[in-house]
């Protein structure tokens, strides 16, 4: 990893490591035969994950039902996040982004339809945000708030997570994260074809609740991104999939070069093909 961070710094860049625990979005073959863990023993419906167990043909299979995390499990995972943050800084990263979105473990606590716990980690919005807060607090204490960002996905249903009242839940999450003075909040918008726009009232509420740097990502191009920043909705715009097929994306945007399409079939499994083998623009 130090080779990567050194290379980024040599080019004058800043690099954060995105830290995530997938929770129930995995398979026993990927974790030494153990049963996956989650906020609750609720299987993610219609979700497949990539496995390569050395015996069967590598490919995508259905996830299994997870087991509900105990209090000791929760403490252990909080500690794992704390140590992961320290490891990232030691490896030369400038900071970390806590991936609390896209249906992964922390999102499985936040969203009401994935969390049916009856203890202090389930039920009310405050309770469902508790695990998020404990992880953030541990990482802030370990490496400093100015090195911690958080990614949320309020309106997606990725990997089977859905919240009954996303506006209320995620406005509360923004205000909660503001208490920890994290450096930024990164919000992933829904970005499938014909996806609805994120409500403007929600964006205004998040802007009011969170005083750090705001980043939005999802279906943005250079024009939409510039407009969002100019309107004060966000401070920065993130690009994900366009970067996969366009390793020189900033230059392509700056000079108006055409963007190469990515292959969606190679995004979530396999090796280098379709992930790190796209060329820079050659004219």
For each predicted feature, which ranges?
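Flavin-dependent oxidoreductase catalytic cores
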Residues: 1-283
């Amino acid at each position: 990893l130090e080779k990567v961070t050194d290379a980024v710094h040599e080019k004058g860049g800043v690099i954060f490591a995105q830290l995530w625990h997938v929770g129930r979005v995995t398979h026993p073959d990927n974790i030494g035969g153990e049963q996956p863990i989650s906020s609750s023993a609720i299987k993610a419906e219609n979700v497949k994950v990539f496995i390569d167990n050395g015996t069967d043909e590598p490919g995508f299979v259905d996830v299994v039902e997870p087991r509900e995390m105990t209090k000791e499990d929760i403490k252990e995972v909080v500690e794992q996040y704390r140590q992961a943050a320290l490891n990232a800084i030691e490896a030369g990263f400038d900071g970390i982004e806590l991936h609390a979105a896209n249906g992964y473990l922390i999102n499985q606590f936040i969203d009401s339809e994935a969390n049916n716990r009856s203890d202090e980690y389930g039920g009310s919005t405050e309770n469902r945000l508790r695990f998020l807060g404990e992880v953030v607090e541990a990482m802030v204490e370990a490496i400093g708030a100015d090195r911690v960002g958080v990614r949320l996905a309020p309106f997606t249903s990725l990997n089977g997570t859905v919240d009954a009242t996303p506006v209320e839940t995620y406005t509360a999450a923004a205000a909660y994260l503001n208490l920890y003075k994290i450096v930024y909040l990164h919000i992933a918008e829904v970005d499938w074809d014909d996806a609805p726009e994120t409500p403007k009232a929600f964006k205004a509420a998040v802007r009011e609740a969170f005083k750090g740097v705001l980043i939005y990502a999802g279906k943005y191009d250079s024009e939409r991104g510039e407009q969002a920043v100019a309107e004060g909705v966000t401070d920065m715009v993130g690009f994900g999939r366009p970067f996969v097929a366009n390793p020189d994306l900033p230059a392509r945007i700056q000079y108006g070069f055409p963007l190469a399409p990515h292959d969606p079939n190679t995004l979530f499994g396999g090796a280098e093909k379709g992930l790190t083998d796209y060329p820079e623009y050659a004219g």
